[in-house]
């Protein structure tokens, strides 16, 4: 029997994951990671945690509400979520602890804000998985001598012949493997993803049959900490000194000024809605120029790019294994599909790669992840620095 630290969010996926781990005979420790930005007191829950189960000396939240469920509306790990997670853990008889990771999560928020202010499109979920869910949680697991860390992600771990591979989840509509590419390769052998072998309807049905009380709970939103308004409003609230500093012109690809905008952080490559100009036919954001503060718009065909360059690459395979992959596809957005193409690691720096698609792809957005698949298997990926505008324009920029 293995000891497993399970990230419990209070949602249906991690709740059923707890059941599946227990069913398979594991010793489960449930951990709720408190990293939202409402007051810590709003999310305090019962914990009789002995001192030796908190080796990192992270703040452990006690109970200030008499154990009653409170409905604190917060997009990320709310008090309601904490209460739901605790209730599920108690019903299954597993120990449950809440760790205050607000300080760690602030760097996720800062990254999100800084990327938009640099005219990139961030993906905070990927960073959170890397830094917190499969970062800090592993630190905690090491401290309690847990062999594995588990979550409710819709992806699959394939452990065989001494190898550990990350694969797509069985439910193609819910697959989250894209958001896991940044995990330390050395940790794959200690990861467990119990719900990845099921579809979402199957997980909800299982939760109902188990009487968990969270079977009809809504899925979490894409940007968990932006709970109201547009993301640009959140960016301005975090960097009020930048209000007005990113305003500029909206121009066509031909250079014609057609309008003005209040801040380029409100835009992303491929965006069609909320452009603030009427062109008579559909126009999209083609590129954002932070130096001139211009937002360049054009027709759909002007979005197409033959390739991209990425850095900060993380690989689960060797250079030779990448070269030998038979059906490589590159996914460039969370809800997208892999596109066939050719991937080349930088000759001197494996943390950089060039991708050339078999067919040009639309909306290659700097700041987003480019994740490389061989069929169902995740080979690795990196962060898009820029799109390649022409076939000949393929060399990675100088370091």
Curated annotation (Swiss-Prot):
Q: Which Pfam families match?
A: tRNA_Me_trans, tRNA_Me_trans_C, tRNA_Me_trans_M
- List the GO molecular function terms: ATP binding; tRNA binding; tRNA-uridine 2-sulfurtransferase activity
Keyword DNA damage assigned to the entry: answer is: no
Keywords assigned by UniProt, alphabetized: ATP-binding, Cytoplasm, Disulfide bond, Nucleotide-binding, RNA-binding, Transferase, tRNA processing, tRNA-binding
Tell where it localizes: Cytoplasm
Record-marked site positions (Interaction with tRNA)? 153, 368
List the active-site residues. 128, 224
Which Gene3D superfamilies does the UniProt record give?
Answer: Adenine nucleotide alpha hydrolases-like domains, HUPs, Translation factors
Q: Which SUPFAM superfamilies match?
A: Adenine nucleotide alpha hydrolases-like
Q: Which residues cross the membrane?
A: none
Spell out the disulfide connections.
Answer: 128-224
Q: Which reaction does it catalyse?
A: S-sulfanyl-L-cysteinyl-[protein] + uridine(34) in tRNA + AH2 + ATP = 2-thiouridine(34) in tRNA + L-cysteinyl-[protein] + A + AMP + diphosphate + H(+)
Function, please? Answer: Catalyzes the 2-thiolation of uridine at the wobble position (U34) of tRNA, leading to the formation of s(2)U34.
Q: What is this protein called?
A: tRNA-specific 2-thiouridylase MnmA
Q: What taxonomic lineage is listed for the species of origin?
A: Bacteria, Pseudomonadati, Planctomycetota, Planctomycetia, Pirellulales
